[in-house]
Amino acid sequence: MLRAAQAILDLPETAYGTPAGTLAALGAALRRAIAGSSGPFYATALLRASRRLADIAEPSARDWAAAFRNAVDSISELGGAHAGDRTMLDALVPAADAFDRALDSDRDPASAWAAAVEAAEHGAQETARMTPRAGRASYLGERAIGTPDGGAVAVSYWLRALQTHVR
């Protein structure tokens, strides 16, 4: 996460011109900065979200929710994992679901994002009870039980970090 954070901090100001451009720049930076499979997963997710927002100058909360859903789906498509496999998707899928549900209930974007963060944190903690079926932890089998999945926990951290910026 430290390398990812530094890669984001090192982006030039020009990377933040549009929502779609920002997401694409973040994806490229994270692809280079994060080792293992997480780098390509994050890069693909951010690029997919970027494409969803490409023609929208000022995305609405629903536009962001659709972009988030596209990003989450792209990780599952690329890696073949699903919620319940004890991966980052066990935080991402509940977060996307909660964000959608909260917006459908006419909650404001900040409140909807708070629900997403809570769902991600709960999902990440639930991975401690799961036997890994995908990802690097799958090699550990039942020995992984008792410790939350690192990828899911990382997701919950960065979703929480974004919370103060959602209005």
Regions found by a protein language model. Give the residues of each.
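N-terminal loops that bind phosphate or other acidic moieties
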Residues: 1-167
